[in-house]
From Swiss-Prot:
Biological process, per Gene Ontology: mRNA pseudouridine synthesis; tRNA pseudouridine synthesis
InterPro entries according to UniProt: PsdUridine_synth_cat_dom_sf, PsdUridine_synth_N, PUA, PUA-like_sf, PUA_sf, tRNA_psdUridine_synth_TruB, TruB_C
Molecular function (Gene Ontology), one example: tRNA pseudouridine(55) synthase activity
Cysteines engaged in disulfide bonds, as pairs: none
Active site: D39 (nucleophile)
Catalytic reaction(s) noted: uridine(55) in tRNA = pseudouridine(55) in tRNA
UniProt name for this protein: tRNA pseudouridine synthase B
Organism: Thermotoga petrophila (strain ATCC BAA-488 / DSM 13995 / JCM 10881 / RKU-1)
Domain of life assignment: Bacteria
Function description: Responsible for synthesis of pseudouridine from uracil-55 in the psi GC loop of transfer RNAs.
PANTHER family listed in its UniProt record: PSEUDOURIDYLATE SYNTHASE TRUB1, TRNA-PSEUDOURIDINE SYNTHASE
Gene designation: truB
Membership in a protein family: Belongs to the pseudouridine synthase TruB family. Type 1 subfamily.
Keywords, ordered alphabetically: Isomerase, tRNA processing
């Protein structure tokens, strides 16, 4: 049984949950989840957790994402995308220069209102379910960040561009906000998620077309996941103690990367097996001082233990 992360490709049409169901069916395991919903009309990278890989998905939701989007100026729909009912169509008299200026004005932080039709929850219910029942919930704006925008192409009313954005950013809302800035509104008509963190569409796998063996072979093992987090190595004899839930004291550590108090740290044994994720109780720079004074204090607090054998 493999545990880890799969970089999946979601085609247009299926929901993110459909991708999860396909992996469950082909790998014959119920422990499958995804790390960030991708709209049915969109395609691209969807991070899938398999078995104990589901327990680290929260860290993938916090990664930057890159999207390619095509929007249609002057078209306004209920859902802010091409699948929604048309609310209004307007003329767009903006010049190409004005369109580009409006797009680039959103680079940086701004307060974005999530669309009424989205997978976001309100009092335990998905917004899109409430909206279909006629219950439109107006959520407060959320501060998001557009790190950069490039490859802007203007062809009449259809405008495409790429954007690198913070987690939780709705590209549909960004398109509508650009449209409103131009005085005509806009709707996303095509959307591709090209990357999540360092994971790109080129390395993604369409699980609907892949055989079970290929899916299993493409699972990234836990030991190679979350490589942006600091790493510590404990003495081999501490393995069982940690897997049984014991907190990590200084004498257990053999070596460590630099880390700050409050950071999440990956805990490995000397064989290279990922044992746990833990929260640092101190800055790593202070550990040598503790060791010099022979103070065997707790330095890491367990958050998740991975007993995969």
């Amino acid at each position: 049984m493999k545990h880890g992360i799969l970089v999946a490709y979601k085609p247009k049409g299926p929901t993110s949950h459909d991708v999860v169901d396909e992996v469950r069916k082909k790998l014959k395991t119920r422990k499958v989840g995804h790390g960030g919903t991708l709209d049915p009309f969109a395609c691209g990278v969807l991070i899938i957790g398999v078995n104990q890989g589901t327990r680290i998905l929260e860290f993938y939701k916090d990664l930057k994402k890159v999207y390619w989007v095509k929007m249609r100026l002057g078209l306004i729909t209920e859902t802010f995308d091409i699948t929604g009912e048309v609310v209004e169509e307007r003329e767009c008299n903006a010049t190409e220069e004005e369109i580009r200026e409006a797009i680039f004005s959103f680079v940086g932080e701004y307060d974005q209102v999530p669309p009424a039709y989205s997978a976001k929850k309100h009092k335990g219910e998905r917004l899109y379910k409430l909206a279909r029942e006629g219950k439109i919930i107006n959520l407060p704006p959320k501060r998001v960040k557009i790190f950069k925008i490039w490859d802007v192409n203007v062809e009449g009313r259809d405008v495409s561009f790429r954007a690198e954005v913070s987690p939780g950013t709705y590209i549909r809302s960004l398109c509508m906000d650009i449209g409103y800035k131009l005085g005509c509104g806009a709707t996303a008509v095509e959307l591709v998620r090209e990357s999540v963190g360092s994971y790109t569409i080129e390395e993604s796998l369409n699980v609907f077309e892949a055989a079970p063996e290929e899916i299993e072979n493409r699972i990234i093992p836990l030991e190679k996941c979350l490589e942006w987090l600091p790493r510590v190595v404990v003495h081999q004899e501490s393995t069982k103690t940690i897997l049984n839930g014991s907190q990590i004291h200084l004498e257990m550590l053999k070596e460590w990367d630099g880390f700050k108090k409050g950071e999440v740290v990956r805990v490995f044994n000397e064989e290279g097996r990922l044992l746990a994720l833990a929260e640092a109780e101190r800055n790593s720079s202070f550990l040598e001082t503790l060791r010099k004074h022979e103070r065997n204090e707790r330095v890491l607090t367990l958050r998740k233990v991975f007993n995969t054998r």
